[in-house]
Regions:
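Low-complexity repeat regions of mature extracellularly deployed or surface/particle-associated proteins
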Residues: 1-189
Length: 189
């Protein structure tokens, strides 16, 4: 496809408050995104790998499922930051680091024309995908977060007063959720 990206790398640093970054890598393999939002509050990062919007209105009517080996890394330091991720295909990795109060995965609804189910999320569709996360100080892994497919893995380390709702559908999937401190909740579905 003319819209496919292969072996591309995007590296973005935003070191203040109220920033937005959106990266879409369409339909290709071996793509890498690294986002660093440190030193500020109210930042939003959006990463989408392996699908194409066919109508320009966030409609996933023609997803590309043959993507693989894509990586995304998001680091957010500060308060009230949020991010969302969507990866389609196999052998994709998502690494998340958040430090500060009120940070979320699957966060704020900043795009009013996008359906709620597609506005804030972490989602990986495919096999052998990995999500590694570190969250501290009252962070939330939102209920819109999913892994679909087989042999997927979630490894999440959270500090005090954190919340996680982890949903996986498929076979031979694993979840490791370490929560330290008080006031934590965790559900695995």
């Amino acid at each position: 496809s003319a819209l496919s990206s292969y072996n591309s790398t995007v590296d973005i640093s935003q070191l203040s408050s109220e920033n937005y970054v959106g990266v879409w890598q369409y339909g290709g393999n071996n793509n890498n995104v690294s986002i660093n939002q440190s030193g500020g509050n109210d930042n939003l990062a959006n990463v989408s790998q392996g699908f194409i919007y066919t109508d320009g209105a966030y409609n996933f009517t023609t997803p590309v499922y043959n993507t693989e080996n894509n990586t995304a890394s998001i680091t957010q330091v500060g308060g009230d930051n949020s991010n969302r991720l969507f990866q389609l295909g196999d052998n994709n990795d998502f690494t998340l680091t958040q430090a500060g109060d009120g940070n979320t995965v699957g966060g704020r609804d900043l795009e009013p024309n996008v359906p709620v189910g597609r506005n804030g999320y972490f989602e990986q569709d495919g096999n052998n995908n990995l999500f590694t996360g570190l969250q501290a100080d009252g962070a939330t892994l939102k209920h819109e977060s999913f892994q679909f497919g087989d042999e997927n893995e979630i490894d999440l380390l959270q500090g005090a007063s954190d919340e996680a709702l982890i949903q996986q559908s498929g076979n031979l999937n694993t979840v490791t959720n370490h929560q330290g401190g008080g006031g934590n909740t965790s559900s695995v579905v």
